[in-house]
């Protein structure tokens, strides 16, 4: 069966994707480190329209997701979407992941979004994919852990 893409309400859908959230956290944070996604906060954002969530399903199983936070630009007041999480099971990375990114972009544009931002690790496959889809490097993000 061909994977399908959908927009979903994270608050109603979180249970079906928890296995992917675990895999995503292990990939990002690493084995043995503590991770603690704030599920209540994510569900509240989804219920208020501040978060838009999309998924990939194959044979009734969630195999990928993307979560975007919606905000108004400080300077222009145009609506923008910042990707706060995206994970695709390794066996679906490649064409399916690219089509999924195109789908999320199309859906966000249809909601009046004027700008989409992604934060990705340097030299990741996602960075190459975003460049292929026409995204440009605009800023660098610096952070400090305490």
Where are these regions (language model features)?
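Short amphipathic alpha-helix that is part of the acyltransferase structural core
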Residues: 1-36
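A short helix-loop-beta-strand connector motif used in the catalytic cores of GNAT acetyltransferases and
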Residues: 43-55
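Conserved beta-strand in the GNAT
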Residues: 55, 61-70
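A conserved beta-turn-beta hairpin within the catalytic core of GNAT-like acetyltransferases
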Residues: 72-83
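A short, internal acetyl-CoA/4′-phosphopantetheine-binding micro-motif in the GNAT/acyltransferase core
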Residues: 84-94
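Conserved acetyl-CoA-binding loop-helix of GNAT-fold acetyltransferases
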Residues: 93-106
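Conserved beta-strand-loop-alpha-helix junction that forms the acyl-donor binding cleft
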Residues: 116-127
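Conserved catalytic-core motifs of GNAT/GCN5-like acyltransferases
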Residues: 119-120, 136-146
């Amino acid at each position: 069966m061909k994977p399908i893409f959908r927009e979903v309400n994270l608050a109603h859908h979180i249970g079906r994707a928890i296995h992917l959230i675990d895999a995503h956290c292990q990939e990002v944070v690493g084995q043995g480190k503590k991770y603690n996604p704030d599920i209540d906060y994510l569900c509240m954002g989804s219920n208020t329209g501040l978060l838009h969530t999309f998924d990939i399903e194959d044979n009734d199983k969630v195999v990928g997701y993307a979560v975007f936070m919606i905000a108004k630009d400080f300077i222009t007041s145009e609506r923008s979407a910042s990707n706060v999480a995206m994970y695709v099971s390794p066996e679906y990375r490649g064409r399916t992941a690219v089509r999924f990114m195109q789908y999320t972009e199309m859906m966000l544009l249809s909601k009046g979004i004027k700008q989409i931002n992604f934060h990705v690790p340097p030299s990741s496959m996602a960075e190459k994919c975003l460049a292929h889809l026409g995204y440009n490097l605009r800023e660098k993000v610096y952070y400090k852990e305490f």
